[in-house]
């Protein structure tokens, strides 16, 4: 196959002008005349009257259950010389859990999971913007339209996917329900789709505060926790690691049935001893315990937590002996110390790069070492060493990787930080919901506290936690909950590791419904005024009880354990004075531009408009010149993949896109036989890799796809982002415009033809046509 350069010089070298938006073609689904004029055919689809009494088509599941469902095929007009885009119109009150993929000339556009060219839709069962329409835009492969006036397109439907599935059956679910409706399809050359004024649009309703549920959910919470604790205490068999941790944590909670219960210590001693006996038969148990999810990360961290929590109760028994299962007597102290040492040896040599994984591994490593210091101080690592690992994992000092016989591996060199200077996680760029790690950093901070004294933790970790929290606050946008009440949601559309997070989860400060998180944990732990303000905003919107109620629907011991401290945290926050802080995107708050040049992401509040953009977008292997946009207005939402202009230092190396259609980053799960990628053979340039960094073409690498400068024009917005530390770039203004305002400088009127963009800074302009 002839290889195609995707840098698209025709597009990137074009003069930036503002022209009246015009569609090349419009297809109205359910309108027989419109469908006939587009050579429309379908399989397993139906027409219905949907939002605002408009006609739509939705794809239906097959009569015999299958992972794939209905299809819509059609032909549309395109521009033969320019980059063309395809947009669909969907109604925001509709919800599904289906996946919709675009096909062009019989080949799949984009990837099914975390691709730089995204899928059309992956529903999460929630309505994203009730009562209004939203538009999703993808680029049509240039090689399918160059020199042509028409292109054959198709939308195919599939069941939902679970991104962590290791088999096709666990990854790809059958399609059992109809998809959301597709109302219209459009082709156009301007990346920011502008609907015709005649199209019906909804409006944001006046959002009310929900009245229920209320404080009664805390009673339900206590019932669940206490019932599970009673079940654990009634066991005559050894407890799992997570049960030990839960029990030890509950020992100091006054409203539980195990509060200062003497039998707790004996249960835990019996259970750790049993774990040790199994460890003697299989030393890998410290990192392969099947009762612990992500066992390689947690190691024997839960046991170490139990030891630390209850050391005052356990120490009197530490030097007593028990039978190790092989007819030999050993003290509890010696046996448990062996477990901690084995865990330390494994975790120090198996550290991981991705931020949340690094944090979890290093946190439980730290806990194991603290437990070892209680049991056998002479064999514990120095406190400064394990604390250094924590500092590395949260971006206070450079992350140096796993330990080797020659010292730290340093796979990313000497200066790679896990967080940006402004406090965002990097995987490799901006991470939305998946990158929300405040709960883990709170847990890390608590691990450094003296047990029973919550404000004695490492001061640098606390300060980093608060920086992260304030930065994350820009990525909460005003919306409504599933019942139409006022709520703030997390921005994840432009996140590298996020799929099916539109709409984002209801979030104010902490991730309310993550397994190990609570809605108020940062605020209750730090009592920082901004954190308390976020917590109070959540409580005032009555979303706190709603989130607790939702968490009660979740199953699993880690969820139940996380419920343990919610009542006390709520009591602490209710005692605080009103804080003078609201989330920045809250209606009525001042306009702003936030940018993070290391992650290549911006968040803009401009009156009633909100713009989120990842300019550095899923460029794992090479420069792709792609951005992802979530543009929120009072009447519509827009989600778009678009090509932008970049400047970078070319390594001379090239990455050729393989024929992958599932994961954009791996061939490991290519289960969709007979489907070919529309991007196979596309050639992408690779940015210069710093000296000393191990790299081969095709590797995921934080330097391979990162550019020095990004320039994006999207609708009325023009963005220039300078990611260098020592270069200055010029951002040219579009021609043929009336006025230009610099949003980065309080909407200052721009009179120059270009603006300097200083190192590590971003300029956002708003152009009036």
PLM features per residue range, with description:
Residues 710, 718, 751-769:
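C-terminal beta-strand-rich structural cap/linker in extracellular carbohydrate-active enzymes
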Residues 226, 230-461:
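Aromatic-lined, polymer-binding surfaces characteristic
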Residues 1-20:
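Bacterial Sec-dependent N-terminal signal peptides
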Residues 73, 452-743, 758:
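Extended polysaccharide-engagement surfaces of secreted carbohydrate-active enzymes
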Residues 20-207:
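Extracytoplasmic
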Residues 204-224:
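N-terminal module-boundary/linker segments of secreted carbohydrate-active enzymes
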Residues 110-128, 698, 739-754:
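Solvent-exposed beta-strand/loop surfaces of large extracellular or lumenal domains
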